[in-house]
Amino acid sequence: MSVKRGIGDSAFLKKKIPQNPKYQHVKTRLDTGSSLTKYMERLEEARKNYRYRKDELFKRLKVTTFAQLVIQVASVSDQNDNIKDEMAGLEDDVSIFSASPGLDCLSDQTNGSPQPNLPPPQTINIDESGDNGFSPRSTLQSVISGVGELDLDKNGQKTIRLSPVSTSNTTECPYPDCPYLLLDVRDRELYDQCHIVSAYSYPIATLSRTMNPYTKEVLDYKNASGKIIIVYDEDERIASQAATTMCERGFENLFMLSGGLKVVAQKFPEGMTTGSVPISCLPSPTGPAGRKRSAQHQTSQLAEKKWRFTAEDLDKIQHYLEEVFIPSETSSRLSSRMSTSSARSKASTVGSSRQGSSIAGSESARSRSSRPWK
């Protein structure tokens, strides 16, 4: 007997779809759930950017978690600075009121009922030269000009100048009571070229010293309650060694920034770092747009001595955080929903106009209603 065979070739389903290398970097916008392709992409990304080991003594910290920590620390420090400025302003006001004795007399005169008979301004002779001047107790000149702010040498008093609190000193120093200590374990030359804002230069060769291998900041943050130490480099090669050595020496609150500057440059191209990012940390260019980006980053620029993030930097970090956490599919879904809602509104307006026209010509509408709608 002959065996029955199905219709068609059995190898037809195994035939591969030809792929165009020109569009290999284009990804689909449709989320089909977990798949082998996504799993392989995650493994490939972890192999390129991270160096996981089975016997790691240290703990890891994601770049996105560090960005959230930076935003929280900056917001809390700004609130504390505003409170300090308000307290300083209140203290200055109190010192002004205490330095002007004429305000007590003025408050006594204006607190109750108005006194019609005010004494004329008395002239007093304070200077040895015999110049006459008005007394601050009997006139409003001291209140108008502001006692303690204007030069009062004419009345024989010393000038009281209020120096404003300089905000430049606060921006040039690190955050007070910062919960994290960021250490750059690369060489000093690489640190001067590019580093993360608020990071200290702590080369790994410092750990090999026999005398004073730790700085004052490291000793202050070592196993302190509510504080952590974060080490990083470009690609986890040096940072993993430094973190292992420090953990072996008794550092229990030590973390390593996963991915280092390489992942920081990929997820936060702006706002997180200062200076020119090394070429090895830049993402591989894809197409003409990528080539233009690499050409722009070739201009070397030395890193600035920044201890705090500016408002513009924080806005950029927040923007890139939203891009990381909010997938791109939501925007496409939102646009599709908006398009469908607009289509429905247009259909409703067209239906209302048709209803009005049908009311005007009821006889023709009745005759057309029997016909099938196409």
Swiss-Prot record:
It holds the Pfam family Rhodanese. GO terms for molecular function: tubulin-glutamic acid ligase activity. Transmembrane segments: none annotated. Residues 329-349 have a biased composition (Low complexity). GO terms for biological process: angiogenesis; axoneme assembly; cilium assembly; neural crest cell migration; protein polyglutamylation; protein transport. InterPro entries: CEP41 (IPR051889), Rhodanese-like_dom (IPR001763), Rhodanese-like_dom_sf (IPR036873). Expressed in various ciliary organs, including Kupffer's vesicle, ear and heart, as well as brain and kidney. Its main location: cytoplasm. Signal peptide: none annotated. SUPFAM superfamilies: Rhodanese/Cell cycle control phosphatase. One of its GO terms (cellular component) is cilium. Residues 176-273 form the Rhodanese domain. Residues 279-301, 329-374 are annotated as: Disordered. Keywords: Cell projection, Ciliopathy, Cilium, Cilium biogenesis/degradation, Cytoplasm, Cytoskeleton, Protein transport, Transport. It is found in: Cytoplasm, Cytoskeleton, Microtubule organizing center, Centrosome; Cell projection, Cilium; Cytoplasm, Cytoskeleton, Cilium basal body. Disruption phenotype: Embryos display peripheral heart edema and tail defects along with ciliopathy-related phenotypes, including hydrocephalus, abnormal ear otolith formation and smaller eyes. Belongs to the CEP41 family. Required during ciliogenesis for tubulin glutamylation in cilium. Probably acts by participating in the transport of tubulin polyglutamylases between the basal body and the cilium. This is Centrosomal protein of 41 kDa. It comes from Danio rerio (Zebrafish).
